[in-house]
Amino acid sequence: GERVTLKAGRSRFVLATLPATDFPVIDELAQQQALTLAQADLRRLLDKTHFSMAQQDVRYYLNGMLFETDGKMLRTVATDGHRLALCEMDMPTKSGVQQVIIPRKGVLELQRLLGTEGEVTITIGSNHVRAQIGDVRFTSKLIDGRFPEYSRVIPSAPQKAIVADREVLRAALQRTAILANEKYRGIRLALKKNSLTL
């Protein structure tokens, strides 16, 4: 087989290699849409929704994140069938209407690569998505499936709305979560006028 030799100072390493022809070749992306936005904006969209992705669901289309443009808004949506997270932002430039599902591993890798400064260019093809971040080009396959119609489960005109101090509610949920167990994972919310009991 092929070998590669590495030399550094007085050290010498000979390593066996695999045939380069076996390395998967990603076809040239047949671009359907490209958009450029701030890395911080894309990172925020991913950070706010990634926790709701399924991990090993038989409904394979849930093991990723919906990346959607409707011409005016850019939206990320994730659900595992029990919870749903959605985050959106105004599009920096006008774009076409498109929905693609990026696999969980691709989303997590993108989060790792994205910084807080500079821009990222997202190119969407029929089977792949590509992110150009500085001199790094990241390409991921897309999940071939139909994401659930998430808009049907989000109330358009909710009958009741709760307004609470975010940190106070978070602290209360963390305290009650201590008593949640494998059998009963839920936390019951009891609403009364001007009070919420967990």
Feature-to-residue mapping (PLM):
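Structural preference for solvent-exposed beta-strand-turn elements
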Residues: 1-198
